[in-house]
Design a protein with these regions (language model features):
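Conserved "landmark" site that anchors the functional core of diverse proteins
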Residues: 1, 6-321
């Protein structure tokens, strides 16, 4: 499908020279698959050809910040499938939310202990943090009191993996700096819920349209009745779905590029849908059969490869012609 291009392909580093006036919080010893700096994302910039990006699981992102007394949209680390290891450079208070991983702290004075998720944890210089691969879910969020510093691009520090815009992915040897944000009294409201695990069947609510009528009635039945597997090629741009029987279009016309939203389910010529995530292209040239209900977007962010998805209709199709 078409992608609206932009000249704003800028990259900033969390260990940039511009950050040297900020206190160093951590040194990165290991990153696992991917560690990104994310905040609430970029809003009101679609006209520039720039997507939202931002934390995929917004509720876990906000929860992590509130636990340590940060403003709810302060920058955090988004950790994909565990593996993060950090060395503490100066005393800090952290919280880790999201996927059900084991959080291990090796205290300089007292040795290795398992710590609780969704709770504030005080750390001293020389301590080490390690996050295991999740048993449930896919992404964790690590907030530190005072926030994480990175340079903003178009009002956000978030990394957009499609446009390569924003703070570059964290690498071994990087230093994480404090944003020195004002903090607030902590209110512990634990909103952690059970996360999907490999083998689970996940029900996702969708609204039909805008191009549902481009598909045959049999294909629409298949869309709801089949169980869709998540491909290992899925990423922050989109979940690639596959099933035994592909969806068949009833209208074979060329579709002009049109705007797409996070959660849009686009169907390319092979009939195997792609569910757009936060880093999706602003426009698409394939028909969108349905879109995920907003309240299930956080759930989508936590579904690991090996789960099955089944879609559930919550609204009727309305032809807006």
């Amino acid at each position: 499908s078409d992608v609206c291009s932009s000249d704003l392909v800028l990259r900033t580093l969390v260990h940039s020279n511009l950050a040297t006036h900020k206190p160093v919080l951590f040194k990165v010893l290991n990153t696992g698959l991917q560690v990104l700096v994310q905040d609430q994302g970029r809003h009101h910039v679609a006209s520039l050809g720039v997507g939202r990006a931002g934390a995929l699981d917004q509720s876990s992102f906000v929860e992590a910040n509130l636990i340590v007394g940060n403003p709810k949209h302060a920058a955090v680390l988004e950790i994909l499938n565990g593996g993060l290891k950090l060395k503490v450079i100066q005393p800090s208070v952290i919280a880790v939310t999201g996927a059900l991983s084991e959080l291990w702290i090796t205290y300089k004075e007292t040795g290795k202990r398992q710590a609780s998720l969704s709770q504030p944890i005080a750390l001293d210089e020389g301590d080490e943090i390690y996050l295991t691969r999740p048993k449930e879910g896919l992404r964790n969020y690590l907030a530190v009191q005072g926030g994480i510093y990175a340079e903003q691009v178009l009002g956000s520090v978030s990394y957009d993996s499609l446009a390569e815009l924003g703070t570059s992915p964290i690498q071994v040897g990087d230093q994480i700096y404090s944003a020195q944000l004002k903090t607030y009294p902590v209110e512990l409201n634990h909103f952690a819920q059970t996360k999907p695990k490999v083998g689970d069947e996940i029900i996702i609510d969708v609204c039909l349209g805008p191009r549902t009528d481009w598909f045959s009635k049999d294909s629409l039945k298949l869309f709801f009745n089949q169980r869709w597997q998540i491909s290992a090629e899925s990423n922050r741009i989109g979940l690639r779905l596959s099933a035994e029987k592909p969806l068949v279009r009833e209208i074979d016309e060329e579709l002009p590029s049109e705007g797409c939203c996070t959660g849009a389910i686009q169907v390319p010529p092979n009939g195997q849908p792609v569910l757009f995530m936060n880093d999706h292209p602003i426009t698409g040239g394939y028909p969108v059969i349905a879109s995920v209900a907003a309240y299930h977007l956080d759930l989508i962010a936590q579904i690991p490869t090996g789960c099955l998805i089944k879609f559930r209709q919550i609204s009727d199709f309305m032809d807006l012609k």
